[in-house]
Amino acid sequence: MVQRKTVDDLFVHMLSDIYSAEKQLTKALAKFARAASDPQLSEAFKTHLEETQGQVERIDQVVETCGIRLKRMKCVAMEGLIEEGQELIEEIDKGPVLDAGLVAAAQKVEHYEIAAYGSLCAIGKQLGFTKGVELLKATLEEEKATDLKLTEFAERAGNEKAASAA
């Protein structure tokens, strides 16, 4: 196991991890969009896919402005969260119950990302990566907004439809 000796090493590790997470998510969101039966939910997943692609580009900008180099790694946490969503798609018929499950799976992803970006902002600030932190904060705010939209969808329509379908 490679030891991370400095806060700089930790920042690079965490940024590499979330980069992997975002790349994995770009593939998963397209599947979630196809699996959703509610047109608004499907569209929300497509919109977040575009946003996620922009977030990957933003990480590239962070790398450039901070003068760091990402490590090749796989975010196993995101892999597991995506697998949970994939299992729902395989096990539940398309409809309101699956939609409710997809919302829950997507919120787990958002909460992971919110935690990751929040930590990166705090560590980046300690390291003096002012421009990089600005970029990371922009992504953090997007993730929070997406989580809020998912909550609103669940409260407004998704979970109610799922309960009446049961």
Functional labels for PLM-detected ranges:
Residues 1-166:
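Amphipathic alpha-helical hairpins
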